[in-house]
């Protein structure tokens, strides 16, 4: 279990920041592997299911966080590599908090030539895409919670996860990771 205390300091009272490689559990099918890409961009690393030529079915990453106060107004921000949509319709992932309803998010379908100046070029220059998913009506109570991410398309590269409950700290890559400890079982 990772201790991601939202009450550790004023900076983290309303959000939890996790590097992608700090997952609690990973699942992958035979012939695929979750691969850490060290020093990718301005984060600790990137994380992707490889090889990209294999199906992504059955793969997932689960993150754990221990909260010391109740948090509501949950919004998860995933910082992803700026992969252009080489798959018709773009790249998608599924995301779920605890045992709640899974949400499907397409994060790059609008990176097309029709949007080259407003969407595609800015994403390429920033080298990242910020994908936001809201969980209306969800309150995270004191204790351990899980966040599960399933790729629905190949070539998704995850940099950072930000569980934001009103902290609204600006920034993506420059946010310092929340304090953490690993408990070995």
Tell me what each language-model feature is.
Residues 56-58, 81-166:
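Beta-strand-rich ligand-recognition modules
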């Amino acid at each position: 279990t990772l201790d991601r205390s939202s009450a550790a300091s004023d900076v983290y009272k309303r959000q939890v920041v996790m590097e992608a490689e700090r997952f609690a559990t990973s699942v992958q099918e035979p012939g695929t592997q979750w691969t850490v890409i060290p020093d990718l961009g301005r984060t600790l690393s990137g994380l992707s299911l490889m090889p990209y030529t294999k199906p992504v079915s059955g793969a997932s990453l689960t993150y754990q966080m221990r909260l010391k106060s109740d948090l509501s107004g949950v919004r998860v921000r995933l910082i992803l590599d700026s992969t252009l949509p080489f798959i018709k319709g773009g790249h998608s992932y599924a995301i779920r908090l605890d045992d709640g309803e899974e949400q499907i998010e397409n994060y790059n379908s609008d990176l097309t030539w029709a949007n080259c100046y407003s969407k595609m070029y800015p994403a390429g220059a920033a080298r990242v895409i910020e994908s936001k998913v809201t969980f209306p009506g969800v309150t995270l109570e004191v204790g351990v919670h899980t966040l599960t991410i399933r790729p629905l398309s190949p070539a998704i590269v995850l940099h950072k996860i930000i569980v934001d409950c009103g902290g609204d700290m600006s920034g993506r890559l420059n946010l310092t990771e929340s304090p953490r400890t690993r408990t070995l079982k």
